[in-house]
Design a protein with these regions (language model features):
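C-terminal tails and terminal domains of large nucleic-acid-associated
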Residues: 226-256
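A detector for small-residue-rich transmembrane helices and their helix-helix packing motifs
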Residues: 1-230, 236
Length: 256
């Protein structure tokens, strides 16, 4: 018990608070059931028809059933401890909420007349999976603790599975759309972030003479430093970083 508590306390700050919010949402769902889901889950007919826009945010934190809560909390624990130190706490939180809200928004657009509540952080968690594949594409993970895959392969495999289920399993289309859109929006968010305007402006300012080596911008140098640290993490794990290297990684992530 003490080991589990120590492990929880060692989680990055935002990851820890998000996990607690999942737990609170699960307890509230146990107490209030369908009433909570109706008002604070994502009910497309109410979100679009009555402009209950708060549902785009609140549905993320409600979980129905112990295993629904455990799965999303486990995925948050597994991914958040790698991503939050790299992205920085504020950007990590913005990214998580963006993926959840964007996934909910697309769900409403696709099924505006649906009266079935959609609840849970799966859309946002799938966005974290996209980020994991983005930052650690070649890191080995084990699907069902048996099958070795790279992070990129895992993201592609789960995307294919969700797409197949949306076509073949009756009644699962809305939830699968939420999962898939969270993954897609997460990837697009990060790809858009690589188009760094600072790098672009630096390139415009530099008028290079023939044969002159291009100067690296400060942003490019910082990105290279971050890449070196990320490579070290992918090979030896997060624990291999010194306190100074970890602080530098947090600083570089906070600028993104």
């Amino acid at each position: 018990m003490n080991l589990a508590l120590e492990s929880f306390n060692n989680l990055p700050r935002v990851t820890r608070w998000l996990a607690l919010s999942f737990f609170a949402g699960w307890l509230l769902e146990l107490i209030f059931g369908h009433t909570l889901n109706l008002y604070f889950g994502l009910v497309p007919r109410l979100t679009a028809g009555r402009w209950w826009l708060w549902q785009l945010l609140t549905y993320i934190f409600i979980h129905a059933g112990f295993w629904h809560f455990i799965f999303n909390a486990f995925m948050l624990w597994m991914l958040g401890r790698f991503l939050e130190p790299v992205m920085g706490s504020s950007r990590f939180l913005r990214f998580f909420l963006f993926c959840g809200i964007a996934a909910g928004f697309l769900t409403v657009l696709v099924s505006p007349r649906s009266a079935t509540p959609v609840i849970g952080a799966s859309g946002a968690v799938y966005g974290l999976l996209a980020a994991f594949a983005f930052f650690y594409p070649d890191m080995k993970v084990y699907l069902y603790f048996i099958f070795p895959l790279t992070a990129r392969q895992l993201a592609l495999a789960l995307a294919a599975l969700e797409f197949t289920l949306s076509l073949s399993v009756p009644g699962s289309k809305v939830a699968n759309i939420t999962h898939l859109s969270g993954l897609a929006f997460g990837w697009l968010y990060l790809k858009a972030g690589t188009l760094d305007p600072e790098v672009f402006l630096d390139a415009l300012r530099q008028k290079r003479r023939p044969g002159e080596m291009p100067r690296r911008s400060a942003a490019e140098q910082e990105r290279e430093e971050a890449d070196v640290l990320l490579e070290k993490i992918s090979i030896k794990g997060l624990a291999s970083l010194s306190s100074a290297e970890l602080e530098k990684l947090k600083r570089l992530g906070g600028k993104a």
